[in-house]
Amino acid sequence: MSVKEHTKKIMKVFDKNMYYVEMGQGNTILFLHGNPTSSYLWRNIMPYMKEKGRCIAPDLIGMGDSDKLENKSAGTYTFIEHRKWLDELLNLLDIGNRVILVVHDWGSALGFDWAKRNQDRVAGIAYMEGIVRPLKNWDEWPSSSAPIFQGFRSEAGEKLVMEKNIFVEKVLPGSVLRGLTEEEMEVYRRPFNIPEDRRPTLDWPNQIPIEGHPKDVTEITKSYSEY
């Protein structure tokens, strides 16, 4: 299992640089990461798939090596904001039709939503730990992690994430059965070494559609869950 990073390409999207890994040719196989990861998540999978198609794995805006947004306040990196930047990147990359999506975590929500809006362009979807529908209440969330995710929606959560970087330092390695090496952890830490750059990792859990909030994400996830 390799810990080596693949060389990334750069695309100017609106006024920012977004980074992505690309290898292979043919119909697009689109890899979308979640929180708090990056295209690095797919480093050991894409080499096996590059003979099957054009593999593309972007770093979402504000994550991985992609540029950060100027606004550092809460609620900057919403689902809708991520969708805007991802849509434009995919348009610029001309990903074509017969797209296969390989998606994880919030990448699944972005991927499902894109698929719902581009149904005639989708050849297949493979998803892991996906956000497949809105949740009625916290009882539907895994009990082992519900308290901390509820805590992210408080002042204490702001401190835990923005000051202590808990999503990278604790939540991420705690969700990987084999554990992560120090070299792997350094790759995931790098985009969030500066406290103010950690905003995406806190905004994402606050976008989880529970009890009807946020309203727009609840409506979007409900719509694609019926797709």
What kind of region is each of these model predictions?
Residues N44-G53, L92:
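A short, Lys/Arg-enriched amphipathic alpha-helix followed by its capping loop at the start of a domain
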Residues N27-H33:
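Short beta-strand element of the alpha/beta-hydrolase
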Residues P47, P58-I61:
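N-terminal cap/lid subdomain of alpha/beta-hydrolase-fold enzymes
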Residues S2-I10, F14-M18, T28, L41, ...:
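Flexible "cap/lid" subdomain of the alpha/beta-hydrolase fold that forms the substrate-access gate
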Residues N35-M46:
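The serine-hydrolase catalytic nucleophile loop
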Residues H33-P36, F192:
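Conserved residues at beta->alpha junctions
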